[in-house]
């Protein structure tokens, strides 16, 4: 019954900690450590290791857990952050953006396939900008190498997101670009890695 958890905090960055005996606990701590909860955690540091002493849920993204599309996107976002950010990289702004994107996903009434890829693309673009690796000229070269129409499609997608007011309108328009959005997400993933 021990649980190794990865915590992403506003003030201390990414922290690895162990919750001893949590799976045997009759308290709700094991539920509190669900990856889709914003929690307040009390940690004890022994040598270079952290131990979870207490956990309290601050915000629960409960609607994400009820929709497989929302769950898929949210877990992808968390997995990406886990791979990109190193332990103790403090970044309060990015933490706030992470909570913002999870809150956004949580309140969406539905997610169409094209919009799902659009959210992932927007998230990856945000990470690339944050990490200082977003270079539109280099991305344009990669897109152009595959097909020259790719740049046109990418610009159309950016226009849709700027010019559309309603979420439902954006979702409908993104359906025309499902395959292209999926391809761009893969290109962005490769670019980050």
Positions of PLM-derived features:
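Non-catalytic alpha-helical scaffolds and adjoining flexible linkers that form interface surfaces
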Residues: 1-3, 8-193
């Amino acid at each position: 019954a021990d649980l190794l958890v990865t915590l992403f905090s506003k003030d201390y960055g990414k922290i690895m900690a162990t919750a001893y005996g949590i799976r045997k606990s009759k308290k709700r701590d094991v539920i509190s450590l669900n990856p889709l909860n914003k929690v307040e955690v009390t940690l004890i540091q022994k040598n270079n290791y952290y131990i979870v002493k207490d956990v309290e849920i601050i915000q629960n993204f409960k609607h994400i857990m009820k929709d497989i599309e929302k769950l898929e996107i949210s877990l992808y976002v968390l997995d990406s952050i886990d791979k990109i950010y190193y332990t103790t990289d403090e970044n309060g702004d990015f933490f706030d953006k992470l909570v913002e994107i999870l809150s956004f996903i949580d309140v969406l009434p539905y997610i169409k396939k094209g919009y799902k890829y659009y959210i992932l693309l927007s998230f990856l673009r945000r990470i690339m900008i944050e990490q200082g690796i977003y270079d539109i000229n280099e991305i344009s070269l990669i897109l152009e190498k595959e097909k020259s129409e790719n740049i046109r499609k990418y610009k159309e997608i950016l226009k849709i997101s700027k010019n559309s007011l309603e979420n439902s309108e954006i979702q409908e328009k993104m359906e025309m670009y499902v395959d292209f959005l999926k391809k761009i997400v893969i290109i962005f993933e490769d670019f980050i890695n």
